[in-house]
Amino acid sequence: MTQRKTAFLVAAAMTATMGLAACSGGSASNGASDGSGVKVTWNMWAGSTDDEKWVADTADIVRSQNPDIELDTQTSSWGDYFTKLTANASSGNLACVTSMNGQRLSGFHQTLSPLSDEDLKKAGIDKSAFADGALDILSYDGKVYGVPYDVAAMMVYYNRDMLAETGTPEPAADWTFDDFVATAKGATTDAHKGFAVGMGEFQWMALPIAKSGVQPVDPSSTLQLTDPAFVEAAEWYADLVLKEKVADPVPSASEAGWGEDQYSNGNVAMAVDGTWNAVGYFTNDAGFKAGATRLPSGDKGSLGLVLGSGFGIAANCEGAERDAALKVLGSLVSKEAQDLIGSSGRSFPALKASQPAYFESLDESIRDDIKAAFEAAFSDTVGQNSTAKWTQVNEYFTPNLVSVYSGAMPMSEMLSQAQAQFGN
Protein backbone atom coordinates (compact mmCIF):
# COMPACT_ATOMS: atom_id res chain seq x y z
CA MET A 1 0.00 0.00 0.00
CA THR A 2 1.16 3.50 -0.58
CA GLN A 3 2.40 4.87 2.70
CA ARG A 4 0.88 8.31 3.10
CA LYS A 5 0.60 10.61 6.08
CA THR A 6 -1.37 8.18 8.19
CA ALA A 7 -0.35 4.96 6.50
CA PHE A 8 -0.60 2.55 9.41
CA LEU A 9 0.61 3.81 12.76
CA VAL A 10 4.00 5.36 13.05
CA ALA A 11 5.87 5.86 16.21
CA ALA A 12 8.36 7.93 17.97
CA ALA A 13 11.68 7.52 19.48
CA MET A 14 14.15 8.55 22.08
CA THR A 15 16.81 8.33 19.40
CA ALA A 16 16.83 9.57 15.85
CA THR A 17 18.10 6.40 14.30
CA MET A 18 17.55 2.71 14.70
CA GLY A 19 20.95 2.37 16.27
CA LEU A 20 22.54 -0.83 17.34
CA ALA A 21 21.15 -4.02 18.66
CA ALA A 22 17.91 -3.93 20.43
CA CYS A 23 18.37 -6.68 22.84
CA SER A 24 21.48 -5.08 24.28
CA GLY A 25 21.53 -3.86 27.84
CA GLY A 26 20.19 -7.05 29.35
CA SER A 27 20.83 -10.73 29.19
CA ALA A 28 19.63 -14.01 30.59
CA SER A 29 22.31 -13.76 33.27
CA ASN A 30 21.17 -10.28 34.28
CA GLY A 31 17.44 -10.94 34.50
CA ALA A 32 15.10 -13.37 36.15
CA SER A 33 13.65 -16.27 34.19
CA ASP A 34 10.31 -14.44 33.94
CA GLY A 35 11.92 -11.54 32.09
CA SER A 36 12.01 -9.08 35.00
CA GLY A 37 15.02 -6.82 35.44
CA VAL A 38 15.78 -6.87 31.72
CA LYS A 39 16.23 -4.10 29.18
CA VAL A 40 14.13 -4.40 26.01
CA THR A 41 14.15 -2.19 22.92
CA TRP A 42 11.09 -1.57 20.75
CA ASN A 43 11.83 -0.51 17.17
CA MET A 44 9.25 1.40 15.12
CA TRP A 45 8.95 3.69 12.12
CA ALA A 46 8.24 7.38 12.74
CA GLY A 47 7.07 10.19 10.51
CA SER A 48 5.91 13.23 12.47
CA THR A 49 5.72 14.95 15.83
CA ASP A 50 2.31 13.38 16.38
CA ASP A 51 3.83 9.97 15.74
CA GLU A 52 6.52 10.67 18.31
CA LYS A 53 3.89 11.59 20.87
CA TRP A 54 2.02 8.36 20.15
CA VAL A 55 5.09 6.19 20.70
CA ALA A 56 6.04 8.08 23.84
CA ASP A 57 2.55 7.68 25.27
CA THR A 58 2.44 4.02 24.27
CA ALA A 59 5.86 3.40 25.82
CA ASP A 60 4.59 4.95 29.05
CA ILE A 61 1.72 2.45 29.06
CA VAL A 62 4.19 -0.41 28.62
CA ARG A 63 6.38 0.88 31.45
CA SER A 64 3.44 1.36 33.80
CA GLN A 65 2.32 -2.21 33.18
CA ASN A 66 5.86 -3.60 33.46
CA PRO A 67 7.81 -1.54 36.02
CA ASP A 68 10.42 -4.29 36.26
CA ILE A 69 11.38 -3.97 32.57
CA GLU A 70 13.53 -1.16 31.18
CA LEU A 71 12.01 -0.17 27.82
CA ASP A 72 13.93 1.79 25.20
CA THR A 73 12.54 2.93 21.86
CA GLN A 74 14.25 3.42 18.51
CA THR A 75 12.78 4.69 15.26
CA SER A 76 13.51 5.68 11.70
CA SER A 77 11.41 7.19 8.94
CA TRP A 78 9.22 4.81 6.96
CA GLY A 79 11.52 5.08 3.96
CA ASP A 80 14.61 4.19 5.99
CA TYR A 81 13.07 1.72 8.41
CA PHE A 82 13.06 -1.38 6.23
CA THR A 83 16.41 -0.56 4.64
CA LYS A 84 18.01 -0.45 8.08
CA LEU A 85 15.99 -3.46 9.17
CA THR A 86 17.52 -5.44 6.32
CA ALA A 87 21.02 -4.40 7.36
CA ASN A 88 20.42 -5.24 11.02
CA ALA A 89 18.78 -8.56 10.14
CA SER A 90 21.82 -9.65 8.16
CA SER A 91 23.92 -9.31 11.29
CA GLY A 92 21.33 -10.87 13.60
CA ASN A 93 21.00 -7.55 15.35
CA LEU A 94 17.27 -6.79 15.48
CA ALA A 95 15.36 -5.11 18.28
CA CYS A 96 13.76 -7.65 20.59
CA VAL A 97 10.40 -6.06 19.77
CA THR A 98 10.40 -5.26 16.08
CA SER A 99 7.49 -3.57 14.33
CA MET A 100 6.38 -5.11 11.06
CA ASN A 101 4.05 -4.20 8.22
CA GLY A 102 1.92 -7.11 7.05
CA GLN A 103 2.74 -6.71 3.37
CA ARG A 104 6.45 -6.92 4.14
CA LEU A 105 6.38 -9.86 6.52
CA SER A 106 7.13 -12.39 3.79
CA GLY A 107 10.55 -10.86 3.26
CA PHE A 108 11.41 -10.71 6.97
CA HIS A 109 9.67 -13.67 8.59
CA GLN A 110 12.95 -15.57 9.02
CA THR A 111 14.29 -12.74 11.19
CA LEU A 112 11.34 -13.03 13.58
CA SER A 113 10.52 -15.71 16.11
CA PRO A 114 7.27 -17.66 15.56
CA LEU A 115 4.78 -17.09 18.36
CA SER A 116 3.22 -20.20 19.84
CA ASP A 117 -0.06 -20.32 21.74
CA GLU A 118 2.05 -20.62 24.88
CA ASP A 119 3.94 -17.44 23.94
CA LEU A 120 0.69 -15.55 23.46
CA LYS A 121 -0.54 -16.85 26.81
CA LYS A 122 2.65 -15.59 28.49
CA ALA A 123 2.07 -12.22 26.84
CA GLY A 124 -1.52 -12.14 28.11
CA ILE A 125 -2.88 -12.06 24.56
CA ASP A 126 -6.27 -13.60 23.77
CA LYS A 127 -6.50 -14.33 20.05
CA SER A 128 -10.30 -14.32 20.13
CA ALA A 129 -10.30 -10.69 21.29
CA PHE A 130 -8.98 -9.49 17.94
CA ALA A 131 -10.95 -8.65 14.81
CA ASP A 132 -11.70 -11.44 12.36
CA GLY A 133 -8.64 -12.15 10.23
CA ALA A 134 -6.40 -9.85 12.28
CA LEU A 135 -3.96 -12.59 13.27
CA ASP A 136 -3.52 -13.43 9.57
CA ILE A 137 -1.84 -10.05 9.00
CA LEU A 138 1.45 -11.16 10.54
CA SER A 139 1.20 -14.86 9.76
CA TYR A 140 3.25 -16.67 7.14
CA ASP A 141 3.21 -20.30 6.07
CA GLY A 142 0.84 -21.22 8.88
CA LYS A 143 2.88 -19.59 11.65
CA VAL A 144 2.14 -16.43 13.63
CA TYR A 145 5.09 -14.01 13.62
CA GLY A 146 3.46 -11.00 15.23
CA VAL A 147 0.36 -9.44 16.70
CA PRO A 148 -1.33 -6.54 14.88
CA TYR A 149 -2.12 -3.19 16.43
CA ASP A 150 -4.38 -2.08 13.59
CA VAL A 151 -6.51 -3.50 10.82
CA ALA A 152 -7.29 -1.95 7.46
CA ALA A 153 -9.24 -2.68 4.30
CA MET A 154 -9.47 -1.08 0.89
CA MET A 155 -12.50 1.04 -0.01
CA VAL A 156 -13.81 3.14 -2.88
CA TYR A 157 -13.84 6.80 -1.90
CA TYR A 158 -16.09 9.14 -3.83
CA ASN A 159 -16.68 12.87 -4.21
CA ARG A 160 -20.31 13.41 -3.27
CA ASP A 161 -20.36 16.93 -4.69
CA MET A 162 -19.06 15.74 -8.05
CA LEU A 163 -21.61 12.94 -8.24
CA ALA A 164 -24.41 15.36 -7.38
CA GLU A 165 -23.16 17.84 -9.96
CA THR A 166 -23.36 15.21 -12.71
CA GLY A 167 -26.62 13.66 -11.49
CA THR A 168 -24.86 10.37 -10.75
CA PRO A 169 -26.30 8.22 -7.93
CA GLU A 170 -24.02 7.58 -4.98
CA PRO A 171 -22.73 4.00 -4.61
CA ALA A 172 -24.67 1.64 -2.36
CA ALA A 173 -23.07 -0.94 -0.09
CA ASP A 174 -24.33 -3.73 -2.35
CA TRP A 175 -23.13 -2.21 -5.61
CA THR A 176 -21.70 -4.29 -8.44
CA PHE A 177 -18.87 -3.80 -10.91
CA ASP A 178 -21.43 -2.79 -13.51
CA ASP A 179 -22.61 -0.13 -11.06
CA PHE A 180 -19.01 0.97 -10.57
CA VAL A 181 -18.46 1.50 -14.29
CA ALA A 182 -21.80 3.29 -14.62
CA THR A 183 -20.84 5.60 -11.75
CA ALA A 184 -17.44 6.34 -13.28
CA LYS A 185 -19.02 7.06 -16.67
CA GLY A 186 -21.73 9.22 -15.17
CA ALA A 187 -19.21 11.34 -13.30
CA THR A 188 -16.84 11.75 -16.26
CA THR A 189 -17.10 15.11 -18.01
CA ASP A 190 -14.82 17.33 -20.08
CA ALA A 191 -13.71 18.91 -16.81
CA HIS A 192 -12.94 15.79 -14.78
CA LYS A 193 -12.76 12.02 -14.86
CA GLY A 194 -14.94 9.68 -12.88
CA PHE A 195 -12.05 7.64 -11.49
CA ALA A 196 -8.30 7.73 -10.89
CA VAL A 197 -6.26 4.54 -11.24
CA GLY A 198 -3.74 3.59 -8.58
CA MET A 199 -0.01 2.94 -8.52
CA GLY A 200 0.37 1.43 -5.05
CA GLU A 201 0.05 -2.32 -4.69
CA PHE A 202 -3.50 -2.48 -3.38
CA GLN A 203 -4.57 0.89 -4.71
CA TRP A 204 -4.53 -0.77 -8.12
CA MET A 205 -4.86 -4.48 -7.30
CA ALA A 206 -7.83 -4.21 -4.92
CA LEU A 207 -10.41 -4.02 -7.70
CA PRO A 208 -8.93 -6.86 -9.82
CA ILE A 209 -8.73 -9.04 -6.70
CA ALA A 210 -12.32 -8.25 -5.76
CA LYS A 211 -13.58 -8.81 -9.31
CA SER A 212 -11.74 -12.07 -9.96
CA GLY A 213 -11.97 -13.54 -6.47
CA VAL A 214 -8.28 -14.42 -6.88
CA GLN A 215 -5.29 -13.15 -4.94
CA PRO A 216 -2.02 -12.67 -6.87
CA VAL A 217 -0.42 -15.16 -4.46
CA ASP A 218 -1.99 -18.52 -3.62
CA PRO A 219 -2.29 -20.00 -0.08
CA SER A 220 1.00 -21.87 -0.53
CA SER A 221 2.81 -18.52 -1.06
CA THR A 222 3.21 -19.19 -4.79
CA LEU A 223 2.92 -16.23 -7.13
CA GLN A 224 -0.01 -16.64 -9.54
CA LEU A 225 -0.06 -13.43 -11.57
CA THR A 226 -1.02 -15.31 -14.72
CA ASP A 227 -4.13 -16.91 -13.24
CA PRO A 228 -6.67 -16.39 -16.08
CA ALA A 229 -9.34 -14.85 -13.85
CA PHE A 230 -6.89 -12.41 -12.28
CA VAL A 231 -5.43 -11.44 -15.67
CA GLU A 232 -8.91 -10.81 -17.07
CA ALA A 233 -9.83 -8.62 -14.11
CA ALA A 234 -6.52 -6.72 -14.30
CA GLU A 235 -7.10 -6.08 -18.01
CA TRP A 236 -10.57 -4.78 -17.18
CA TYR A 237 -8.91 -2.40 -14.73
CA ALA A 238 -6.45 -1.08 -17.33
CA ASP A 239 -9.33 -0.61 -19.75
CA LEU A 240 -10.86 1.95 -17.42
CA VAL A 241 -8.18 4.18 -18.91
CA LEU A 242 -7.72 2.66 -22.36
CA LYS A 243 -11.28 1.84 -23.44
CA GLU A 244 -13.82 3.25 -21.01
CA LYS A 245 -11.95 6.58 -20.83
CA VAL A 246 -13.16 7.18 -17.28
CA ALA A 247 -9.61 7.62 -15.94
CA ASP A 248 -6.47 9.36 -17.13
CA PRO A 249 -3.13 7.59 -17.63
CA VAL A 250 -0.52 8.21 -14.95
CA PRO A 251 2.06 10.76 -16.18
CA SER A 252 5.15 9.12 -14.66
CA ALA A 253 6.37 6.54 -12.18
CA SER A 254 7.19 9.34 -9.76
CA GLU A 255 3.44 9.81 -9.23
CA ALA A 256 3.38 7.00 -6.67
CA GLY A 257 0.19 8.27 -5.04
CA TRP A 258 -1.53 9.29 -8.28
CA GLY A 259 -5.03 8.01 -7.60
CA GLU A 260 -5.10 9.12 -3.99
CA ASP A 261 -3.74 12.59 -4.80
CA GLN A 262 -6.16 13.12 -7.67
CA TYR A 263 -9.04 12.26 -5.38
CA SER A 264 -7.93 14.27 -2.34
CA ASN A 265 -7.33 17.33 -4.53
CA GLY A 266 -10.89 17.15 -5.84
CA ASN A 267 -9.87 16.34 -9.42
CA VAL A 268 -11.79 13.06 -9.85
CA ALA A 269 -14.99 11.48 -8.57
CA MET A 270 -13.60 8.19 -7.24
CA ALA A 271 -10.42 6.42 -6.16
CA VAL A 272 -9.45 3.32 -4.19
CA ASP A 273 -7.48 3.63 -0.97
CA GLY A 274 -7.29 2.13 2.50
CA THR A 275 -9.36 2.79 5.59
CA TRP A 276 -6.29 4.38 7.20
CA ASN A 277 -6.81 7.54 5.13
CA ALA A 278 -10.54 7.88 5.79
CA VAL A 279 -10.32 10.78 8.24
CA GLY A 280 -8.00 12.72 5.94
CA TYR A 281 -10.33 12.33 3.00
CA PHE A 282 -13.47 13.20 4.95
CA THR A 283 -11.79 16.37 6.23
CA ASN A 284 -9.99 17.19 2.96
CA ASP A 285 -8.46 20.60 2.28
CA ALA A 286 -10.06 20.77 -1.17
CA GLY A 287 -13.42 21.36 0.49
CA PHE A 288 -15.57 18.67 -1.13
CA LYS A 289 -17.91 16.32 0.71
CA ALA A 290 -16.47 12.81 0.74
CA GLY A 291 -18.14 9.43 0.83
CA ALA A 292 -16.85 5.86 0.93
CA THR A 293 -18.09 2.33 0.62
CA ARG A 294 -16.88 -1.22 0.13
CA LEU A 295 -15.36 -2.57 -3.06
CA PRO A 296 -18.01 -3.56 -5.64
CA SER A 297 -18.98 -7.20 -6.14
CA GLY A 298 -19.10 -9.33 -9.26
CA ASP A 299 -19.96 -12.88 -10.26
CA LYS A 300 -17.52 -14.19 -7.64
CA GLY A 301 -18.57 -11.87 -4.85
CA SER A 302 -16.19 -9.20 -3.60
CA LEU A 303 -12.91 -10.50 -2.23
CA GLY A 304 -11.28 -7.99 0.10
CA LEU A 305 -8.09 -8.34 2.14
CA VAL A 306 -7.53 -7.44 5.77
CA LEU A 307 -4.28 -5.49 6.06
CA GLY A 308 -2.33 -3.87 8.85
CA SER A 309 0.83 -3.69 10.92
CA GLY A 310 1.95 -4.98 14.29
CA PHE A 311 4.77 -6.16 16.50
CA GLY A 312 6.93 -9.28 16.52
CA ILE A 313 9.78 -10.76 18.54
CA ALA A 314 13.20 -10.94 16.89
CA ALA A 315 14.69 -14.39 16.32
CA ASN A 316 17.90 -13.21 17.99
CA CYS A 317 15.97 -12.37 21.18
CA GLU A 318 16.32 -15.31 23.55
CA GLY A 319 16.04 -16.39 27.17
CA ALA A 320 15.08 -13.76 29.73
CA GLU A 321 15.09 -11.07 27.06
CA ARG A 322 12.48 -12.96 25.06
CA ASP A 323 10.33 -13.45 28.15
CA ALA A 324 10.50 -9.72 28.83
CA ALA A 325 9.79 -8.94 25.17
CA LEU A 326 6.64 -11.06 25.35
CA LYS A 327 5.46 -8.94 28.28
CA VAL A 328 6.15 -5.79 26.27
CA LEU A 329 4.30 -7.26 23.30
CA GLY A 330 1.28 -7.94 25.48
CA SER A 331 1.26 -4.37 26.74
CA LEU A 332 1.66 -2.90 23.26
CA VAL A 333 -1.61 -4.54 22.20
CA SER A 334 -3.37 -4.27 25.57
CA LYS A 335 -6.75 -2.57 25.76
CA GLU A 336 -5.16 0.52 27.28
CA ALA A 337 -2.72 0.84 24.37
CA GLN A 338 -5.39 -0.03 21.80
CA ASP A 339 -7.77 2.53 23.32
CA LEU A 340 -5.02 5.12 22.86
CA ILE A 341 -4.77 4.27 19.17
CA GLY A 342 -8.53 4.34 18.72
CA SER A 343 -9.25 7.49 20.71
CA SER A 344 -6.61 9.40 18.77
CA GLY A 345 -8.36 8.56 15.48
CA ARG A 346 -4.97 7.60 14.08
CA SER A 347 -5.79 4.05 13.04
CA PHE A 348 -8.47 1.38 13.45
CA PRO A 349 -7.54 -0.87 16.40
CA ALA A 350 -7.11 -4.59 15.89
CA LEU A 351 -8.63 -5.27 19.31
CA LYS A 352 -12.41 -5.47 18.93
CA ALA A 353 -13.13 -3.89 22.31
CA SER A 354 -11.15 -0.77 21.34
CA GLN A 355 -12.73 -0.19 17.93
CA PRO A 356 -15.65 1.91 19.26
CA ALA A 357 -13.08 4.39 20.60
CA TYR A 358 -12.00 5.11 17.03
CA PHE A 359 -15.49 6.13 15.92
CA GLU A 360 -16.10 8.09 19.13
CA SER A 361 -12.98 10.14 18.36
CA LEU A 362 -14.38 11.34 15.04
CA ASP A 363 -16.31 14.54 14.53
CA GLU A 364 -20.05 13.95 14.60
CA SER A 365 -20.36 15.32 11.06
CA ILE A 366 -18.40 12.39 9.61
CA ARG A 367 -18.75 9.69 12.28
CA ASP A 368 -21.79 7.83 10.96
CA ASP A 369 -20.60 7.86 7.34
CA ILE A 370 -17.16 6.47 8.21
CA LYS A 371 -18.61 3.86 10.55
CA ALA A 372 -21.01 2.62 7.86
CA ALA A 373 -18.21 2.52 5.29
CA PHE A 374 -15.93 0.55 7.63
CA GLU A 375 -18.65 -1.94 8.50
CA ALA A 376 -19.21 -2.59 4.80
CA ALA A 377 -15.50 -2.70 3.91
CA PHE A 378 -14.61 -5.25 6.60
CA SER A 379 -17.62 -7.50 6.03
CA ASP A 380 -15.96 -10.01 3.66
CA THR A 381 -12.22 -9.65 4.20
CA VAL A 382 -9.69 -12.47 4.34
CA GLY A 383 -5.98 -12.59 5.15
CA GLN A 384 -3.50 -11.63 2.46
CA ASN A 385 -1.42 -14.38 0.89
CA SER A 386 2.15 -13.29 0.32
CA THR A 387 5.48 -14.45 -1.03
CA ALA A 388 9.06 -13.66 -0.08
CA LYS A 389 9.48 -11.71 -3.33
CA TRP A 390 6.36 -9.56 -2.88
CA THR A 391 8.31 -6.33 -2.41
CA GLN A 392 10.31 -6.96 -5.59
CA VAL A 393 7.12 -7.71 -7.50
CA ASN A 394 5.65 -4.36 -6.56
CA GLU A 395 8.87 -2.51 -7.32
CA TYR A 396 8.67 -4.07 -10.78
CA PHE A 397 5.05 -2.99 -11.22
CA THR A 398 5.55 0.70 -10.48
CA PRO A 399 7.30 1.86 -13.68
CA ASN A 400 5.54 -0.70 -15.84
CA LEU A 401 2.07 0.37 -14.76
CA VAL A 402 2.77 3.73 -16.39
CA SER A 403 3.36 1.88 -19.67
CA VAL A 404 0.21 -0.19 -19.18
CA TYR A 405 -1.96 2.86 -18.57
CA SER A 406 -0.52 4.61 -21.61
CA GLY A 407 -1.20 1.59 -23.82
CA ALA A 408 2.49 0.96 -24.50
CA MET A 409 2.44 -2.41 -22.71
CA PRO A 410 -0.50 -4.82 -22.38
CA MET A 411 -1.48 -5.61 -18.81
CA SER A 412 -1.15 -9.32 -19.59
CA GLU A 413 2.45 -8.78 -20.69
CA MET A 414 3.35 -6.95 -17.49
CA LEU A 415 1.87 -9.76 -15.41
CA SER A 416 3.48 -12.55 -17.41
CA GLN A 417 6.90 -10.89 -17.25
CA ALA A 418 6.57 -10.43 -13.49
CA GLN A 419 5.50 -14.06 -13.11
CA ALA A 420 8.49 -15.24 -15.15
CA GLN A 421 10.92 -13.10 -13.17
CA PHE A 422 9.62 -13.62 -9.63
CA GLY A 423 7.47 -16.73 -9.78
CA ASN A 424 10.20 -19.30 -9.16
Each predicted region: which residue ranges?
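Short, low-complexity disordered leader/linker segments with a strong preference
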Residues: 1-40, 64, 416, 420-424
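Extracytoplasmic "Venus flytrap"/periplasmic binding protein-like
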Residues: 61-129, 165-167, 262, 269-270, ...
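A structural signal for short loop-to-beta-strand junctions that line the ligand-binding cleft
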Residues: 95-96, 123-162, 193-194, 291, ...
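Periplasmic solute-binding protein
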Residues: 107-116, 134-170, 198-220, 306-314, ...
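Short, solvent-exposed loop/beta-turn-alpha elements that line the ligand-binding surface or hinge
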Residues: 116-130, 173, 194-195, 214-233, ...
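Glycine-centered hinge/linker elements that transmit conformational signals in sensory
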Residues: 184, 222-251
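C-terminal capping/gating helix-and-loop segments adjacent to ligand/active sites or protein-protein/ligand interfaces
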Residues: 368-419
